[in-house]
């Protein structure tokens, strides 16, 4: 499995403010390919802050967003939400990287991001859900 992984703790300067903004949004977008609910695409200050941090993490001058995908949105999976193995990146034409930023204080133990080579294999990588942690893969 040839997969890169970047884990950045304390990713946002003011995660409590971003979380507060996120909780004020409507979560009504249901997608059959991913669990939970999502908001519409974000932009503005949050996008600028995330882009700046990602440029440093990846050592690049520009971030090219794949706007055909669910880019820069908040997702909510409440307790009891069914989750399953799914693909966040569908191929080279739809983005080389995906990322999750955790903004839940005191998350459920054993929650986080798991990476599988395929549905037929065991999990290759597990990264815990830690408040203000970005996981890029």
Locations of the language-model features?
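Fe(II)/2-oxoglutarate oxygenase catalytic core
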Residues: 1-137
